[in-house]
Design a protein with these regions (language model features):
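Short hydrophobic/aromatic patches at helix-to-coil boundaries
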Residues: 100-102
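Structural signal for interior beta-strand "rungs" in well-ordered beta-sheet cores
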Residues: 1-91, 95-98
Length: 102
């Protein structure tokens, strides 16, 4: 589902059940996993891979070419400057993994 004012650029792939919320930007060649939630005003630079069932919190930014592993949560307002593992909570500027979800 793509909400109003969201931007999805060329070559991006949004899989089944994913939500691209209001005013989010998904740049070229990003891959958004099934059932992921890209919250309002998130900016994903080019070639970002977001795993299945990931939530990227409101106003977060993800630097080009990075990956966020399946089932992870990125806190609101975070700046992701390195890959995020699967099944973790990460937040901050720069985003740091702070706890496991399993």
């Amino acid at each position: 589902m793509v909400m109003p004012l969201a931007v999805i650029n060329a070559g991006a792939c949004v899989n089944e059940g994913a939500i691209i919320n209001t005013a989010a930007v998904v740049e070229h060649d990003c891959i958004i996993g099934a059932y992921a939630h890209i919250c309002p005003r998130v900016a994903l630079a080019g070639n970002v891979t977001v795993g299945e069932r990931v939530q990227v919190g409101i106003g977060s930014c993800v630097i080009q070419g990075l990956s966020i592993g399946a089932n992870s949560i990125v806190g609101a307002g975070s700046v992701v400057v390195k890959n995020i593992a699967a099944d973790v909570v990460a937040f901050g500027n720069p985003a740091q993994e702070c706890r496991n979800l399993v």
